[in-house]
A protein has these predicted regions:
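Membrane-proximal envelope and lipid/glycan-remodeling enzymes
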Residues: 46, 54-65, 136-157
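Substrate-recognition element of Asp-dependent hydrolases with the DxDx(T/V) motif
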Residues: 34, 39-69, 75
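Structural alpha-beta junctions
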Residues: 50, 80-85, 114-119
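Glycine-rich, phosphate-binding/catalytic loops in enzymes
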Residues: 13-17, 74, 117-120
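Substrate-recognition "cap/lid" segment bordering the active-site pocket of phosphatases
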Residues: 58-100, 106-109
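Acidic, Mg2+-coordinating phosphoryl-transfer loop and its flanking beta/alpha structural elements
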Residues: 100-141
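Active-site neighborhood of HAD-like aspartate-dependent phosphohydrolases
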Residues: 1-33
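Short, conserved loop/helix-junction motifs that constitute active-site signature segments
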Residues: 48, 94, 111-115
Length: 158
């Protein structure tokens, strides 16, 4: 979730109390996070495609016990209550199995032990959600269905 579908690092640097060593420890920190560009539309496109059983897997902050409830509320606010039924909070992402894990880092929270393919957002291969959607939906659909279909057109239809 952090720096994958919401701007976690930006919020850390823009905190009103820059003297705090752990700004993420403040009540309300996670609720105030802004969505990443294209993330809401991208996740919804994956869900609506019917090709994937989409779950949100996020590591909680040990510095903020409220991160559990705030992350859940953030998902409800941006995606609706239905996706909250598919929210998994785990400090070790390697404990879970799946076909794909979309994350901003490749190790440190068990990503290196994830049993499927890691799609690392923010890299040359996947700089943002546009490239993830092109890969995920383009990979699964016949080329004639997506070759002239841009992400902005997809956003208009969702």
């Amino acid at each position: 979730m952090n720096d994958t579908i919401c701007h976690y690092t930006d919020a850390m640097y823009k905190q009103l109390s820059p003297s705090l060593k752990y700004p993420q420890s403040q009540l309300g920190f996670y609720l105030a996070l802004k969505p990443m560009e294209g993330a809401i539309e991208g996740v919804n496109a994956l869900i609506n495609s019917g090709l994937y059983d989409v779950y949100i897997l996020t590591a909680p902050s040990i510095m903020n016990a409220h991160s559990y409830s705030e992350k859940r509320l953030w998902i409800e606010q941006h995606f609706g209550i239905e996706l909250c039924h598919k929210l998994i909070l785990s400090p070790n992402k390697g404990l879970l199995k799946g076909d794909y894990l979309i994350d901003d880092i490749s190790f440190g929270k068990g990503q290196e032990n994830f049993d499927g393919k890691l799609i690392q957002i923010g890299t040359a291969a996947f700089p943002g959600w546009d490239s993830i959607i092109e890969y995920m939906l383009g990979y699964m659909l016949p080329k004639t269905l997506y070759q002239n279909y841009t992400f902005s057109q997809m956003k208009e239809e969702i």
